[in-house]
């Protein structure tokens, strides 16, 4: 039986809640890896916690800046030995992505650099409001070309775009956020699919799950996920 890769979003600044999420998502059927974003990383003790964290984790910083600043941001996490994935914004451009990938090879070769395309909280209307004239599919495909060209290891996109990306760029690690178990609320997400749709139908390499796993009873939610997939 295939062991699917799930990144669980530890979207909190409370270390005790993080410990509970990690403890309660532990199981033998799925590979569940904690994902830490801006809220935890910027919190008072978040970074210190990650310095001492003994297991592999995903650092979701979505870096987006000039090449030099972005490169030094990677250099500054050299001490986070168990970081295995980090996100950067494709909007930062080809030179920034190249600089980050180059620095990552020096800092920690084990880190996979993932390029974030259009956030799953956005839709075509949202993009139009910010001045974009192309639709989501067109933008993501354009960004995918740059991500591949930059040497980055993977791409973050919704399941809708992932179908095309998987066919066109087979070597890219495809990660899909915007995942909800059947019946769960969309909350602030716009482009949402179920774990089954993403992992089984679209065959993405991994998914990100937040509230569908971490809200209310975590252990029960993990079992719901297992029953849903298998």
Give residue spans per PLM region.
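A C-terminal functional module that forms or caps the active site or interfaces directly
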Residues: 36, 40, 44, 157-206
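Conserved anion-binding
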Residues: 2-3, 69-154, 158-162, 166, ...
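Acidic (Asp/Glu)-rich catalytic clusters
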Residues: 22-29, 47-54, 76-80, 101-108, ...
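Hydrophobic faces of well-ordered beta-strands that scaffold small-molecule active sites
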Residues: 4-10, 32-36, 57-61, 84-88, ...
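Generic structural signal for well-ordered alpha-helices
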Residues: 19-23, 47-50, 74, 94-101, ...
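Glycine-rich phosphate-binding active-site loops on the catalytic face of alpha/beta enzymes
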Residues: 84-93, 181, 191-221
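Conserved alpha/beta-domain cores
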Residues: 10-53, 61, 67-70, 159, ...
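Active-site-proximal loop/turn and secondary-structure-junction residues that shape catalytic pockets
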Residues: 12-14, 38-42, 63-65, 90-94, ...
């Amino acid at each position: 039986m295939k062991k699917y890769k799930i990144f669980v979003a530890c979207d909190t600044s409370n270390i005790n809640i993080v410990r509970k999420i990690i403890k309660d998502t532990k199981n033998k059927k799925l590979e569940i890896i904690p994902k830490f974003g801006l809220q935890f990383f910027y919190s008072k003790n978040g970074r210190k916690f990650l310095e001492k964290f003994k297991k592999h984790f995903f650092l979701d910083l979505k870096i987006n800046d000039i090449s030099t600043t972005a490169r030094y941001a990677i250099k500054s996490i050299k001490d986070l030995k168990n970081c295995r994935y980090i996100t950067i914004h494709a909007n930062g451009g080809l030179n920034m992505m190249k600089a980050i990938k180059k620095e990552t090879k020096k800092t920690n070769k084990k880190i996979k650099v993932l390029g974030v395309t259009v956030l799953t909280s956005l839709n075509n209307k949202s993009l139009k409001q910010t001045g974009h004239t192309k639709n989501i599919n067109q933008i993501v495909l354009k960004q995918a070309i740059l991500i591949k060209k930059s040497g980055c290891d993977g791409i973050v996109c919704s399941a809708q775009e992932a179908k095309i990306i998987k066919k066109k760029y087979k070597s890219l690690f495809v990660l899909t956020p915007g995942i909800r178990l059947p019946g769960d609320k969309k909350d602030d997400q716009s482009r949402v699919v179920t774990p089954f749709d993403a992992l089984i139908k679209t065959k993405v390499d991994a998914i990100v799950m937040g509230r569908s796993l971490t809200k209310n009873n975590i252990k029960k939610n993990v079992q719901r996920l297992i029953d849903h997939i298998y």
